[in-house]
Amino acid sequence: MKLILLILTAYLLGSIPTGLWIGQYFYNINLREHGSGNTGTTNTFRILGLKAGAATLLIDIFKGTLATLLPVLVGASNVSPIAIGFFAVLGHTFPIFAGFKGGKAVATSAGVLLGFAPLYLLFLAAVFVLTLYLFSMISLASLTASVVAVISVLTFPAAHFLLPGYDWLLTITIVVLAAIIILRHQDNMKRIKQQSENLIPWGLNLSKQQPTNHH
């Protein structure tokens, strides 16, 4: 019973559509009708600005972290925190409070890792920031970090680097989260190929793509 309650709580936590609600209640703007139509951090930044984007990012990360820490907070030592955190990402991606149309799972996945393996998250965040600096594309940075996450979760434990040993639940969760992130970025991948992906005004833009307003 406790397990079911933890899963349900994590899913409902993840389901809070941060960007959508911030847009509706503070800006009277429906994010679904602007930019890419996505309710995640990137579109919130683009449409509503820095304050709203930063708030969305922090809350979406916090959703994942809090869900991951739930078993610890309620003293359920026999329940895997990473497994509970996964249901927050599921909620974020398919939120019951927003017609099951949610974000692209990046921020909340980061939150889950922050609660479970913070040093490992720091490594993936460095990969994300480096890719973002080189290519000026948030989507490409997210995809690169996801692929690196899968490779590293399979290899780092052997060298006891950042991850102390193989944890099959962590490994499965990382692989599934990476798959969700990649699947949620299908449109972005097409635009990257066509050299029409949205750029941010930071970094080297090594692909030499021209800035575009394409959404």
Curated annotation (Swiss-Prot):
SMART domains: G3P_acyltransf
Class in the EC hierarchy, top level: transferase
Pathway connected to this protein: Lipid metabolism; phospholipid metabolism
Pfam families: G3P_acyltransf (PF02660)
Gene Ontology process terms (BP): phospholipid biosynthetic process
Sorted UniProt keywords: Cell membrane, Lipid biosynthesis, Lipid metabolism, Membrane, Phospholipid biosynthesis, Phospholipid metabolism, Transferase, Transmembrane, Transmembrane helix
This protein's GO CC annotations: plasma membrane
Subcellular location: Cell membrane
GO MF, one example: acyl-phosphate glycerol-3-phosphate acyltransferase activity
Quaternary structure and partners: Probably interacts with PlsX.
Function: Catalyzes the transfer of an acyl group from acyl-phosphate (acyl-PO(4)) to glycerol-3-phosphate (G3P) to form lysophosphatidic acid (LPA). This enzyme utilizes acyl-phosphate as fatty acyl donor, but not acyl-CoA or acyl-ACP.
Protein name: Glycerol-3-phosphate acyltransferase
